[in-house]
Regions:
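C-terminal flanking tails of non-heme Fe-dependent oxygenases
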Residues: 1-148
């Protein structure tokens, strides 16, 4: 892949990086065990860094369509490829499809916390002939209804 600039330069001085703290409350016991806490999706940004969650639940999908539980070992950092890295690499690096499933019954009374750091390129970074980081983000936020 021919990136417009090195990845480390793309995120340098970015004003759109975002750290989220997500709280998944404990279950009451009447939830459907097959329901999802977060449906399968890919992140819009370049790369997501994620400290292992406090409880199991995060799963990633492999290229054959199989789901795999992600570790919650302390000190582990998960690296997810986002749609912007897929775009800038011309599809060479596919976005990580992931979801959060309900916990098993023996741990369902515990809250789950997650802290993803979404790394975004600077607005003017050229992702492809069609997009800068800014135009790509705006288009995607419109698609999912987070921007009008």
């Amino acid at each position: 892949s021919n990136f417009s600039e090195p990845l480390k330069n793309m995120i340098k001085d970015s004003r759109t990086n975002l750290l989220r703290v997500i709280h998944y409350p404990p279950f009451l016991g009447d939830e459907d065990s097959k329901s999802l806490r977060a449906a399968a999706h890919e992140d819009i940004n370049l790369i997501t860094l994620l400290v292992a969650g406090t409880r199991p639940g995060l799963e990633a999908k492999d290229k054959n369509g199989n789901w795999h539980q992600i570790t919650t070992d302390p000190g582990t950092i998960i690296v997810n490829i986002g749609d912007m890295l897929k775009e800038v690499s011309g599809g060479y690096y596919p976005s990580t499809t992931h979801r959060v499933v309900n916990p098993s019954s023996e741990i369902n009374n515990d809250s789950r916390y997650s802290m993803p750091l979404f790394l975004h390129p600077r607005d003017e970074v050229k992702l492809s002939k069609n997009y800068t980081a800014n135009t790509y983000l705006k288009e995607r936020l419109l698609e999912i209804g987070l921007k009008s």
